Amino acid sequence: MTAQTQELTKAQQYNFNKLQKRIRRNTGQAIADFNMIEDGDRIMVCLSGGKDSFTMLDILMSLQKSAPISFELVAVNLDQKQPGFPEHVLPEYLESLGVEYKIVEEDTYAIVQDKVPEGKTTCALCSRLRRGILYRTAKELGATKIALGHHRDDILETLFLNMFYGGKMKGMPPKLVSDNGEHVVIRPLAYCREKDIIKYSDMRGYPIIPCNLCGSQPNLQRQAVKQMLNDWDKRFPGRIETMFRAMQNVVPSHLADFSLFDFKSIDKNSGVINGGDIGFDKEEIAPQVVEDEDLVMEFDPSLQLNVTNI
């Protein structure tokens, strides 16, 4: 091995350690902020075979070793009998990790193919079937929490999807009770950036399983929103971080949802609420400081985005 190769290896290791530290820190912070994991929890980690769920399991196993509390992890994969699904990959990988796991075999593929007309997206029905099976499995395993691998970009994409197409400000919750009311669902990667996860996954060399084995058409609306956010991230560095921060800094008095704020009872004796109304004056938006790639950068006000032109 040449000195140049050794130096490159050292540089790669340094970058890997830095990236792993950031993902660990972001995951740990999300877990703490939302009280996702408690002492004695048994976490069912849903493993699809994609970069996000592999990274989630990896980081949770790492945090488990140093956490001040005790919790169990059990990795679960649903083999939906899609054609070409490599059944040996996940068992071999999970055996090598020494983590408890369960492979659930359910032929949902045949059901979906029978029920959904050719050419139509199968994702909605497939998702409902998968969700029901995972809920049942969590109960069988005695899991106290169900961990999903959605990251910060997924959460933002869902917010914009709901605003653009659903007419509501609704994202993807870091922690919430499942729709059947029986399980607590957590998203430990809620603070993690997709681009970090992609880099980390490449460095780790996970045995990624393709997500399009079913041949379903992609969700074009989500693809469009994803592309929009990626474009914004390139044109306006730090914009994604600021938008996600906005989800944690909601001011109901300055929106229009009367179920969240009692507008009807306001009179001149109500006092100034959250800075009050400044009439015809345009609000001055103070530049925000964001952290990106561990380098702190201040926004340039000249880059402010005119959303009316999008």
From Swiss-Prot:
It is found in: Cytoplasm. Signal peptide: none annotated. GO terms for biological process: tRNA thio-modification. It is an enzyme of class 2 (transferase). A motif (PP-loop motif) lies at residues 48-53. It catalyses: cytidine(32) in tRNA + S-sulfanyl-L-cysteinyl-[cysteine desulfurase] + AH2 + ATP = 2-thiocytidine(32) in tRNA + L-cysteinyl-[cysteine desulfurase] + A + AMP + diphosphate + H(+). [4Fe-4S] cluster binds at C123, C126, C214. Binds 1 [4Fe-4S] cluster per subunit. The cluster is chelated by three Cys residues, the fourth Fe has a free coordination site that may bind a sulfur atom transferred from the persulfide of IscS. NCBIfam families: PRK10696.1 (NF007972). This is tRNA-cytidine(32) 2-sulfurtransferase. It comes from Vibrio cholerae serotype O1 (strain ATCC 39315 / El Tor Inaba N16961). The lineage of its organism: Bacteria, Pseudomonadati, Pseudomonadota, Gammaproteobacteria, Vibrionales.
